[in-house]
C-alpha cells in the first residue's frame, strides 16, 4: 500500500523542480494528482503547457492517475478551477502542495515596484489564493493538509532577495496561522524551507568557487529530497504534525525554531529613548542575531 492511497492532491508549480518531483512521488505513493503549472519562465513571463503535461504523462505511464491544469495561482478564480478539476475528475481533494514561484532578484535600492509586486503576487498572494479556494472544502470534510513553501532567504536572509525573502517569511507566518485556525477542523499546515538544485537556484548569482561547489552538490541537493518530505507531511502518518517549519537540504532534515522572546527587560514606568540607549541595548546586545549565515545546528545521524 502507498502512503497516500485514496488521497487526491493538488500540486502547483508541478511541472518543474520540487513541484514536479512532489507530484511524481505522491503518485507513486498512491495519490491521484492534479498537476498545475502555468509553464512560465523563471521571471514569470510567458506560458507553456508542456511541463505540466509531461509530468502527467510520466505518472500515467507508471500506472498512476493525474490530470494537468495550466492556470495561474495569482488568480483566485483560476485556483478555484484547479479545485473543481480535482473534485470533478477524482471525486475529492485532501492536500495541497504549493511550490509555484518565480524570481525577480535585485538589491533593494535598485528594485522596482513591479519587481516587488510580482514576487508578492505569485508567492504570498498565491499561497493565500490556494488556501482561500480550498479551506471551505477541507473544513467541511474535517480533513485537509497544506504544505507551504518558505525559504531560508526569508527565515535567515539573502542579499539581493528582499522581495522574495519578505514573501517567504510571510508564508511561514501564514502557515502558522492557518494551522492555528484549522486545528479545530483537522486542517494542518506546515512550511518547508528547501535546499535543492532547481532552475530557480541556478539563477542566483554566485562566484566561480561557489558555482563549482554547487555543481558538485547537484545530486545531493536533488529536488527529490524536499518532495519526499512534502509527501510524508501529506500522509495520515503525520496527522499530529502542524504549524511547524522544516528545512531539507541534501541528506539533512531540520526543524526550525520560531520567533519567541529571548529575554525581557522590565522598567517601572516604562522605557524612554534615553533609558533604552543607556540600559536596554547594552544588556540586550548579547542576544542579538548576527548578520550572515547562522552557525550550523547540531547534526544527529539516524
Predicted regions located by residue number:
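Canonical Rossmann dinucleotide-binding motif of NAD(H)/NADP(H)-dependent dehydrogenases/reductases
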Residues: 2-35
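A glycine-rich helix->loop->beta "capping" turn
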Residues: 5, 62-65, 85-98, 104, ...
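C-terminal helical subdomain
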Residues: 212-302
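Substrate-binding pocket helix/loop in short-chain dehydrogenase/reductase
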Residues: 59, 107-108, 112-117
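Residue(s) in the substrate-gating loop at a strand-loop-helix junction
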Residues: 151
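Active-site helix of classical SDR
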Residues: 131, 167, 175
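Active-site-adjacent segment of SDR/Rossmann-fold oxidoreductases
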Residues: 22, 28-29, 138-140, 156, ...
